[in-house]
Every structure is written in structure tokens, then in C-alpha cells.
From Swiss-Prot:
Belongs to the UPF0319 family. Keywords: Signal. It comes from Vibrio parahaemolyticus serotype O3:K6 (strain RIMD 2210633). This is UPF0319 protein VP1009. It holds the Pfam family DUF2057. The keyword Transmembrane does not apply. Residues 1-21 form the signal peptide. The keyword Ribosomal protein does not apply. PANTHER family: UPF0319 PROTEIN YCCT.
């Protein structure tokens, strides 16, 4: 009996702060994302843009987007396409229109030099007012196609930083939970992390049934 009580207490402690975080952003606020020509959006709050329709919608509060430069420059026979690595941008926004532009460059040589840097001077604004943001240049993997599994790389980055997105809304795991997860494994396939993710995506009724099942183990 003591073992059952301990198991229930363990799961309540494990998910308690997470459940609270999941209900932080219950009211949807109209925040749309637009970008300058040549700035490609790859992910919005953990969801691939292949699964989203435009204009992309953000939430009131913490947001994360993955973007890269994908731009044609030059004219005629000298016209070429330049690409940067994907960058993870994090920021907080309120209602309105959020706009992202890339730093300017005149030719491919300038672009290549700019893309070598770990950070770029992205121009991020909400309702025409500049806002602060964090950025991380995704390193990619070794080989000919370093970003072919970008979704897995993003999930691993978020896991190691204690960030999870449920239904397009950000959930931050507690520092203790995030540290514990990182120490146990650096893979996204951690059973503990899978359990956290599954619990976050449950309805209230499913959570009650789950906790009932846990108490019976």
C-alpha cells in the first residue's frame, strides 16, 4: 500500500508544475506573424509550417519560431539563391502583428560571411516597435544534409532547455525536471520525457483515468 501511495505522490510531484503551466495561456490573443521576402519560417511554437496555414498565428506570451534566410539575389545570369542555417528565435509578444526581417547584404560573398556568424541582427518588431529576442543558430548534423531531421534537432534542443509545446502553446518544465531529464539522457526518446509529453496532451478526464491507473499499479 505504501508503494502505491509513493507512486501516486511521485506522479503528482512530477506533473504538478507542468499541469499548472499547461493552463497558463488559456485565452487566445490575435497575434499574427509575417516576414520580409527571403525570410522563411520553418517552425512556429514547435509545429512545422508544413502543417500550418498562413498567416501564422502566435500566442500572447512566450513564442518560438525557427527561421532561415532563403533569398534570391543578383540579376540575369548572376542571379543565385543564398541560404542561412536555421535560427531559433524566442520572444514574448502581445496582440498585433509581429514582423521579422533579416540583416541586409548586397551579394553572395557578403551573405556567406554573414551566415558564418553564430548570431545575426534579425529585425523583430511588434506593431512596428522593436522587441528583444533570443537566438540560437542550429548546428545541424554531420553529412551532406545537416538539417534533414530538423524536427528532431529542434525537439532535442527544447528538451535540453526544458521547453515543450502542447497544441502550439509553450510549456516550460521546472528547472529540476529539465535537469533530471538532461542527466538521464540526451535523446528525445527518454521514457520520462515521453510520459511528460503524453500527460500534457491528455484531457482532464484522461488525466483522472491515468492517475487512477497509476494508483492501481
Amino acid at each position: 500500500m505504501r508503494l502505491k501511495t509513493w507512486i501516486v505522490a511521485f506522479f503528482l510531484g512530477l506533473f504538478g508544475t507542468t499541469v499548472n503551466a499547461d493552463t497558463t495561456h488559456k485565452t487566445d490573443v490575435s497575434v499574427t506573424l509575417s516576414t520580409a521576402q527571403g525570410v522563411q519560417v520553418l517552425f512556429v511554437n514547435g509545429v512545422s509550417t508544413d502543417e500550418l496555414s498562413t498567416p501564422y498565428t502566435l500566442i500572447d506570451g512566450s513564442n518560438q519560431v525557427v527561421i532561415k534566410v532563403n533569398k534570391a539575389i543578383g540579376r540575369g545570369d548572376k542571379r543565385t539563391q543564398v541560404y542561412s542555417a536555421p535560427y531559433i528565435l524566442g520572444f514574448s509578444s502581445g496582440a498585433g502583428e509581429l514582423y521579422i526581417d533579416a540583416p541586409s547584404f548586397r551579394d553572395k560573398r557578403q551573405a556567406d560571411k554573414l551566415f558564418e556568424k553564430d548570431t545575426m541582427d534579425w529585425k523583430v518588431s511588434i506593431n512596428d516597435k522593436s522587441i528583444d529576442y533570443s537566438q540560437y543558430k542550429m548546428p545541424g548534423k554531420k553529412g551532406a544534409f545537416p538539417y534533414s531531421n530538423l524536427d528532431e534537432q529542434l525537439a532535442e534542443y527544447n528538451e535540453l532547455n526544458g521547453v515543450y509545446f502542447s497544441n502550439g502553446k509553450r510549456v516550460e518544465l521546472s528547472e529540476l525536471q529539465a535537469t533530471g531529464t538532461a542527466k538521464e539522457t540526451h535523446r528525445v526518446n527518454s521514457p520520462l520525457t515521453k510520459a511528460k509529453i503524453a500527460y500534457l496532451e491528455m484531457t482532464d478526464e484522461e488525466r483522472q483515468l491515468f492517475m487512477k491507473w497509476v494508483s492501481q499499479q
